């Protein structure tokens, strides 16, 4: 491979402060810095977990991302609510992007904790476009498009399912639950 630059910068080896491939147990927040807790949440796919973050926020907490919309993830949250913090201590839920493991339980958490969901304007608009579309028409158009592109039927079926709206999102995140963050906005 030809380097893009004649200058080569020696980079230090990665450091794993908690050990290589170590992660906390599901539902057991682990403090990684003052007021910053790492929360491991299960996923029912090959990548078997997502990392969520609990941030100390004055006398309460901010939750960053919510987990998959599944009974298993709700049970993990209920464990956190009985062992680490109470729902009333959650001041807000920040959704970083619209993947179902990040937004999946956002509406459930907002209702359970009586707090707003913060999401960027672009992500909220994209989420709305996905959740209000005609799903049957979208799947048919996607199937036709990928067939014309020459993809195998198995690949097409997997991709159309991946892009479909039957994701494990607990319930639709409503605009009334949200504080939409505009470009350059401050939380």
Where are these regions (language model features)?
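Conserved beta-strand hairpin/beta-sheet module of binuclear metal-dependent hydrolase folds
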Residues: 26-84, 88
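Short solvent-exposed loop/turn micro-motifs enriched in small/polar/acidic residues
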Residues: 22-23, 46-48, 178-181
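N-terminal presequences and immediately downstream first alpha-helices
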Residues: 1-21
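Core dinuclear metal-dependent hydrolase active-site scaffold
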Residues: 31-32, 54, 180-187
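A generic secondary-structure micro-motif detector
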Residues: 17, 67, 95-96
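Short, compositionally biased leader-like segments
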Residues: 21-25, 156
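Intrinsically disordered, low-complexity segments enriched in polar/charged residues with Gly/Pro
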Residues: 15-18, 32, 39-42, 167, ...
């Amino acid at each position: 491979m030809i380097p893009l630059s004649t200058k080569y910068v020696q980079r230090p080896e990665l450091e794993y402060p908690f050990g290589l491939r170590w992660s906390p147990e599901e539902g057991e927040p682990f403090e990684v810095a003052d007021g910053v807790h790492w929360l491991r949440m299960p996923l029912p796919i090959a990548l078997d977990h997502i990392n969520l973050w609990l941030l100390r926020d004055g006398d309460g907490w901010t939750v960053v991302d919510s987990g998959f919309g599944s009974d298993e993830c709700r049970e993990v949250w209920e464990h956190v609510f009985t062992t680490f913090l109470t729902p009333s201590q959650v001041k807000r839920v920040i959704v970083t992007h619209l993947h179902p493991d990040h937004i999946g339980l956002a509406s459930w958490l907002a209702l359970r904790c009586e707090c707003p969901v913060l999401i960027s304007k672009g992500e909220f608009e994209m989420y709305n476009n996905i959740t209000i579309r005609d799903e049957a028409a979208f799947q048919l158009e996607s199937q036709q498009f990928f067939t014309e592109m020459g993809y195998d039927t198995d690949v097409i079926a997997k991709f159309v399912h991946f892009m479909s709206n039957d994701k494990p999102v607990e319930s639709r995140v409503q605009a009334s639950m949200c504080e939409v963050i505009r470009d350059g906005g401050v939380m």
